[in-house]
From Swiss-Prot:
Belongs to the MoxR family. The gene is moxR1. Pfam families: AAA_3, AAA_lid_2. This is Chaperone MoxR1. It comes from Mycobacterium tuberculosis (strain ATCC 25618 / H37Rv). It comes from the Bacteria. Displays ATP-enhanced chaperone activity. Required for the proper folding of the peptidoglycan endopeptidase RipA and its secretion through the TAT secretion system. In vitro, prevents thermal aggregation of MalZ protein and protects the functional activity of the restriction enzyme NdeI from thermal inactivation. Could be a moonlighting protein that uses a multipronged approach to dampen host-directed immunity for efficient replication, survival and pathogenesis. Can enhance virulence by inhibiting autophagy and apoptosis, and disrupting cellular bioenergetics. Binds and activates host TLR4 on the surface of macrophage cells, leading to the activation of the host NFKB and MAPK signaling cascades and enhanced secretion of proinflammatory cytokines. Inhibits autophagic flux via activation of PI3K-AKT-MTOR-ULK1 signaling cascade and represses apoptosis via inhibiting protooncogene c-FOS and MAPK JNK1/2. Interacts with RipA. Interacts with host Toll-like receptor 4 (TLR4). PANTHER family: MAGNESIUM-CHELATASE SUBUNIT CHLD, MOXR FAMILY PROTEIN. Gene3D superfamilies: Magnesium chelatase subunit I, C-Terminal domain, P-loop containing nucleotide triphosphate hydrolases. GO terms for cellular component: peptidoglycan-based cell wall; plasma membrane. Residues 1-33 are annotated as: Disordered.
Length: 377
């Protein structure tokens, strides 16, 4: 017996990676098919506006939006000069809200990012001055250059979504999203994120080089007067879209598939993957399962659906698991990457063939319904 949302009966709600409760029940967006089509059109406008500035990197732009809709944080890794920082700044400008940037350096201390109490001699009292972490969108540039105590302070804010200064608690504004960047090729003067802290990020996205055609377009587009991004969304729009994404339908068979994939990273020998057992020291936590479901729901909304299909789950699994797997020294010596492990698991765990559409929902994607209705007028 399953619930209306395709989850096993009695499963109840769960918490998204952002720590907010979400119900598994499926609720259609206000306005039905036309309402969903309008929301998807708004998301498409936002993506188009970002792509006016960022040439190529289509998956990066889409995953950043999915992370925002999922209330999860994003870790970007790539060599210098591939538009990691520009992508985050442009994205924050397009989706609205307050934006703050912290350039991490070895001499930072936690109060530099969180804030502190300042004594006002004229009034003979203390004032609380909040740090740059209090913003809707925070860019943590080169997060692996800051010492561990600064990283821990930031990642605690990411998880708890509030800061405590002088015995007072200050909540983070909503929505709250941290996008951190790091450079994988520098090993001197850096402080790699520990496994427990990497687990706080919903996605880890590897940002690669552009193609020759894309690089040529970058030169033409940025050569004279670089284009300026315009705001498309507001914070109210974001909160509404997050709620819509959280209510997207997920078939119980897909939930079971996600659980089996994540479990296979912990006990691969039970599925006959003895090679994976020698590669992985520690598998993914239940937070990864929650992240995959939340991200698949958001990706479905970006793609114009109010239900999740197997392809949505397959696409987000590598980005959710990539930074959560702890490989053995033997695997690192043999140049076994997390991608190799993830592909091996996906090839072994059978993907269910299910009817992903809710029985009491739409039989075809709502955007298609709206388009058909418009053409029939």
């Amino acid at each position: 017996m399953t619930s209306a949302g395709g989850f096993p009966a009695g499963a109840g709600g769960y918490q998204t990676p952002g720590g907010h409760s979400a119900s598994p029940a499926h609720e259609a967006p206000p306005g039905g098919a036309e309402g969903l089509a309008a929301e998807v059109h708004t998301l498409e406008r936002a993506i188009f506006e970002v792509k006016r500035i960022i040439v190529g990197q289509d998956q990066l732009v889409e995953r950043m939006l999915v992370g925002l809709l999922s209330k999860g944080h994003v870790l970007l890794e790539g060599v210098p000069g591939v538009a990691k920082t520009l992508a985050v700044e442009t994205f924050a400008r397009v989706v609205g809200g307050t934006f703050s940037r912290i350039q991490f350096t070895p001499d930072l201390v936690p109060t530099d990012i969180i804030g502190t109490r300042i004594y006002r001699q004229g009034r003979e009292e203390f004032d609380t001055e909040l740090g740059p972490v209090v913003a809707n969108f925070l860019l943590a540039d080169e997060i692996n250059r800051a010492p561990a105590k600064v990283q821990s302070a930031l990642l605690e804010v990411m998880q708890e979504r509030h800061v405590s200064i002088g015995g007072r608690t200050f909540p983070m504004p909503s929505p709250f999203l941290v996008m951190a960047t790091q450079n994988p090729i520098e090993h001197e003067g850096v402080y790699p994120l520990p496994e427990a802290q990497r687990d706080r990020f919903l996605f880890k996205i590897n940002v690669g080089y552009p193609s020759p055609e894309e690089e040529r377009e970058i030169i033409y587009r940025m050569g004279v007067t670089p284009p300026q991004a315009k705001q498309i969304l507001s914070t109210g729009d974001l909160l509404r879209l997050q709620e819509i994404a959280a209510n997207n339908f997920v078939h119980h068979a897909l939930v079971d598939y996600v659980v089996r994939v994540v479990f296979a990273t912990r006990k691969p020998e039970q599925l006959g993957m003895n090679d994976v057992k020698s590669w992985v020291a520690f598998g993914a936590s239940p937070r990864a399962s929650l992240g995959i479901i939340a991200a698949a729901r958001s990706l479905a909304l970006v793609r114009g659906r109010d239900y999740v299909i197997p392809q949505d789950v397959i696409e987000v699994i590598p980005d959710v698991l990539r930074h959560r797997l702890v490989l053995t020294y033997d695997a690192l010596a043999d140049e076994i990457s997390p991608e190799i492990v993830i592909n091996r698991v996906l090839q072994t765990v059978a993907l269910p063939q299910v009817n992903a559409v809710p029985q009491q929902g739409h039989s075809v994607p709502p955007v298609m319904q709206a388009a058909a209705a418009a053409s029939g007028r």
